[in-house]
Amino acid sequence: MAVVLRGGITGGFLHHRRDASSVITRRISSVKAAGGGINPTVAVERATWLPGLNPPPYLDGNLAGDYGFDPLGLGEDPESLKWYVQAELVHSRFAMLGVAGILFTDLLRTTGIRNLPVWYEAGAVKFDFASTKTLIVVQFLLMGFAETKRYMDFVSPGSQAKEGSFFFGLEAALEGLEPGYPGGPLLNPLGLAKDVQNAHDWKLKEIKNGRLAMMAMLGFFVQASVTHTGPIDNLVEHLSNPWHKTIIQTLFTSTS
């Protein structure tokens, strides 16, 4: 996942925990030199994923969630860095939707409210209103259109909000100022990030939750492969015997 490589790992590994507004603090003191000139001294304090780490120069802290984590140097090329930023953002959003959907449907299934399949078997369900082939074709068309428009906005920022960009008259509702954040009343109905001062805070919250969701999805994959049950089932089993029903014992049991 390019996501983790670009931005870093949040949580307990951070050197300093701060709000986005104080991720980078600059203190400039001016001292008069003997000749009457001004000698500025700049001290820059960065939150990093590892104490004492010197972040690479291309990760200067301006990106949301940038804690200087790029051991492979994938973002050294500016154009590649732009692409990885968008890749992380999209994967984060899909992961957040996926985690929420899995937990919600699993809760309905385990409580008996709805007769639903466990999440990793949902793709095998047959629907009466359409065949599997029809659903695949429809998904290709809809997702293909959306992803094509997103890529075009990445190549030419703001182009999809212009009149005549073939968006069924919704161009005015896509007034975002940068790729990945189309904004407007369609995708930002509450206007949460219209305030420039708070926009970075919302971006940081989104990327932190997105990274957490991607780790959760990875956990769901491993969980399903090892236990062949859903996350709610595993949680209930763990709570029934917290000292003996843990991830470590489960992994050792499955390998023995």
From Swiss-Prot:
Binding positions for chlorophyll b 2 per the UniProt entry: 93
Q: Name one Pfam family in it.
A: Chloroa_b-bind
Q: Where does chlorophyll a 4 bind?
A: 209
What modifications does the entry list under PTM / processing? Answer: Photoregulated by reversible phosphorylation of its threonine residues.
- Transit peptide range is 1-32
- Summarize where chlorophyll a 6 binds, as residue positions: 238
**Topological relation to the membrane, as annotated:** Multi-pass membrane protein
Q: Tell me the null mutant phenotype.
A: Slightly lower NDH activity in immature leaves. Smaller version of the NAD(P)H dehydrogenase-photosystem I supercomplex (NDH-PSI) supercomplex. In the double mutant lhca5 lhca6, drastic reduction of NDH subunits accumulation upon increased light intensity.
**Induction text:** Induced by high light (HL) but repressed by low light (LL). Slightly inhibited by cold.
The listed locations are: Plastid, Chloroplast thylakoid membrane
Membrane-crossing residues? 94-113, 129-146, 212-232
Miscellaneous information on this protein: Light emission at 684 nm upon excitation at 410 and 470 nm.
Q: What is this protein called?
A: Photosystem I chlorophyll a/b-binding protein 5, chloroplastic
Q: Which organism is it from?
A: Arabidopsis thaliana (Mouse-ear cress)
Q: What is the lineage of its organism?
A: Eukaryota, Viridiplantae, Streptophyta, Embryophyta, Tracheophyta
Name of the gene encoding the protein in the UniProt record: LHCA5
